[in-house]
Structure formats: structure tokens, C-alpha cells
Amino acid sequence: MTDDTELLKKRFLELANKSYNSGIFVFTDFLGLAEQSAFSEIKKELRGIPYTAFGGAVGAERVIIRFGSEEDLGYEVPFPISVIKAEPVSQKFADKLTHRDFLGAILNLGIERSTLGDIAIIDNVGYIFASEDIAEYIVSSLTKVKHTDMRLKIVDELPEGELYRTELRRVQANGERIDAIVAKVFGMSREDSSTLFKKRLVFVDGKCTENTSYIPKIGEVISVRGHGRMIYRGCDSYTKKGKMNITLEVYI
């Protein structure tokens, strides 16, 4: 466990206790998978202090944790998250924009990663989740992504349909071990899959796991940094040779 992780865990407990002792809602910054994993390790130390994790939309990977609840405090405070719609001025002449393109352009403005949530892209339009106190600056400062001129505005509603799209995928494996599933879905060898676990790049429901033989539970989200994420839907049948047909929802 690194010193930075220990400091982060102490910070979580400080924020939780501040909420409890002062009777107010307290928010973290946006948390990535590694930070969420650190939070999962101190949940038992919260002594029943309520919390909620939310990233601006159902299915968001990067989330803010809010300590406190309406039931306990008697009032409600929404998450301080703004949604920025970023679209090319002209789709006809726009580059094909990726998550990396959007993130790089925003970070080049001098913005801290901790103030940014997910960036979802639909039909070459980016939906950027950001802290309220930085959103207006992004809107006024981000004029170009890659070589494409952009038009930005803060929106109150997300596009209809699923912002985070998944596709059903079936893989065949000898068992439900998580390392085998990761290897099959991302087209790599078991050895390469095992390396990802050793590097602490695999997370189950936001908690890091190095256990290559872990059997996922139905509904758990498996995230692999640098590769993608999926929802485990279980084994629904067997092949004639006895292999399992495993179904997953893979984020696309």
C-alpha cells in the first residue's frame, strides 16, 4: 500500500466525519478506479455514516462520493456536477474524435483530472461531466479538439437512450475465472491477462482485485484500465465439449 493511498483513505474518513459531526453534506472530488478501490477499503470504518456515489449519469465510471443523506440531515443537496455538450461546429469537416482527444484538450487548459468525470461520446459529440466550479471555464476556453473547431454549452438533460452503450457478447471458456474472461473478451493470452492483475489494473465494482481465480457474480462490473469494462451476466449453457457459454455486456 503506497503512502498516497494511505493519505487518501485518511482523507475519506476526515470528510465522512466532517459530514457526521457538522450535519452537512460533504463531497469528494471525482474518483477514478484506483481511488474508488481505496475507498472500498475503509467502508467498515465509516461506522454507519451514509454515503452515495454518483458520476452524473447511471453507469458512469468516475464518480463523486457524497457523505450524508436527506433522511439523516433533513434536506437535500444535489451533486455538484455539470454536463457539458461539446460538438463540432461542422460535423462534415470534423475529425473522428476519441475520448483521448477530448481529455487531452481539456487537460491542456490546465484543469486537474480530479475535477473531471467521464467523457461519453455519441455520434462524435462529447458529453463531459465536470465539477460545477470549473464547467463555465471549460465552456469558454475549449474551442478546439484535435483539429476540429468546437461549440460547447452546459446542458440540463442528457440525450435520449443510453449514454453508456453496451453490446451482448458470448465467450466460451473452461470456467468462470475472471482472468479467463478478461483474456477472451479483450483478445489476449491468459499470461497477458494475469499480468494485468499483477499490475493492479483490474477492478470489480470499483475494487481492485489481484485474484486471477475470482469468480464474478452476476451483475458485477469488471473494469480493466486501458482496455474497457463489462457487466458479467453469467453462464447460460454449455458446449458439447463441456465449455461454458458466458454472457457479458461489454461497454462500447
Give residue spans per PLM region.
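Ferredoxin-like alpha/beta domains used as RNA- or RNAP-binding modules
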Residues: 1-179, 185, 208, 221, ...
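Basic (Lys/Arg-enriched) interaction patch that binds polyanionic ligands
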Residues: 175-226
